[in-house]
Swiss-Prot record:
GO biological-process terms attached to the record: translation
Composition bias type Basic residues, residue spans: 113-125
Its biological purpose: With S4 and S5 plays an important role in translational accuracy.
CDD domains named in the record: Ribosomal_S12
Gene behind the chain: rpsL
Name the UniProt record assigns to this protein: Small ribosomal subunit protein uS12
Stored InterPro entries: NA-bd_OB-fold (IPR012340), Ribosomal_uS12 (IPR006032), Ribosomal_uS12_bac (IPR005679)
Length: 125
C-alpha cells in the first residue's frame, strides 16, 4: 500500500493489456494474400484435418488463419479478408478468414447460420 506522498510523486500505473490479435492493429479486418493453404491436426482430445492458410497481410504481418465451413476454393495467391478470433484446438491460429468475401466463396448449400459462412438465401421451390 503506497503512502499519499508516493502516489503524489508517481501516481497509479494502468495495467497494459496485450492484444489477442496484434496483426489487426486495432482494425476489424485486414486483406491479405494466401502464401500456403494446408490442413493441420488439432490438440489432444480432438481429431480432424482442419483447413488453415498462411496469409501475408497488407501491413506486412504473416499469420495463420482458419478456413471455416465445409469445403473451400482457396489456393496460393488467393486474396482473402482476415478477421480476428482464435481456434481453441489449433495452437498458433489466432485469425479467421471471412467466407464469401474477395476470392473465398461462401459455403455451398448452407441453410442455417448463412451469414457466418457467406451463403446466399436459397431460392424458393
Amino acid at each position: 500500500m503506497p503512502t499519499i506522498n508516493q502516489l503524489v510523486r508517481h501516481g497509479r500505473q494502468t495495467e497494459v493489456t496485450k492484444s489477442k490479435s496484434p496483426a489487426m492493429q486495432g482494425g476489424p479486418q485486414r486483406r491479405g494474400v494466401c502464401t500456403r493453404v494446408y490442413t493441420t491436426t488439432p490438440k489432444k482430445p480432438n481429431s480432424a484435418l482442419r483447413k488453415v492458410a498462411k496469409v501475408r497481410l497488407t501491413n506486412g504481418f504473416e499469420v495463420i488463419s482458419y478456413i471455416g465451413g465445409e469445403g473451400h476454393n482457396l489456393q496460393e495467391h488467393s486474396v482473402v479478408l482476415v478477421r480476428g478470433g482464435r481456434v481453441k484446438d489449433l495452437p498458433g491460429v489466432r485469425y479467421h478468414i471471412v467466407r464469401g468475401s474477395l476470392d473465398l466463396q461462401g459455403v455451398k448449400d448452407r441453410k442455417q447460420s448463412r451469414s457466418k459462412y457467406g451463403a446466399k438465401r436459397p431460392k424458393k421451390a
